[in-house]
Amino acid sequence: MFLSTYENKIDKKGRVSVPASFRSHLSNLGYNGVICYPSFNNQSIEACSQDRIEKLSASIDSLSPFEEKRDYFATSILSESMNLQFDSEGRISLSTKLLKHAKIKNSMLFVGQGQTFQIWEPAAFEKFKINARKKANLNRASLKWEKHFNNNEGK
């Protein structure tokens, strides 16, 4: 699972180190890299495992081939996705297109989202986070809590 937030800088060759815990999780899934694509929800880069992008692809494929929504999702996600392999030091090279989308210049935040993570320009993420916390507070009653405990833990 991808948890926490880490800040890393782009080196002179345009590479950035992916946090060790994120690389470890991807490696445990049998993948030595990450799939990245520009978010269509916000000004970030979406990042996920090979398995996750295959699930997204299957979800898109489940739509009728003649449905416009299928083309919208395939174009916005699959055609924009990049398969980035880690080098020997756990770094990736994000394309200029991805960096421009997120307005990243020298430093970026790797933001854990559970099964995925996002890559943000730090100041943009801080603004987003403030708004997200407000909206989470307003919508907290809609978060479902399944009881997974035999004793009364987690109530």
Swiss-Prot record:
Q: Which InterPro entries match?
A: MraZ, MraZ_C, MraZ_dom, MraZ_N, MraZ_sf, SpoVT-AbrB_dom, SpoVT-AbrB_sf
Q: Does the keyword Cytoplasm apply?
A: yes
Gene Ontology terms for molecular function: DNA-binding transcription factor activity; transcription cis-regulatory region binding
**GO CC annotations?**
cytoplasm; nucleoid
GO BP term, example: negative regulation of DNA-templated transcription initiation
UniProt keyword list: Cytoplasm, DNA-binding, Repeat, Transcription, Transcription regulation
> Which residue numbers delimit the SpoVT-AbrB domain?
5-52, 81-124
Q: Do the record's keywords include Hydrolase? A: no
Q: Which Gene3D superfamilies match?
A: Transcriptional regulator MraZ domain (3.40.1550.20)
Just give the chief location class.
Answer: cytoplasm
Q: Where in the cell is it found?
A: Cytoplasm, Nucleoid
Q: How does it assemble?
A: Forms oligomers.
- What family does the entry list? Belongs to the MraZ family.
Q: What is this protein called?
A: Transcriptional regulator MraZ
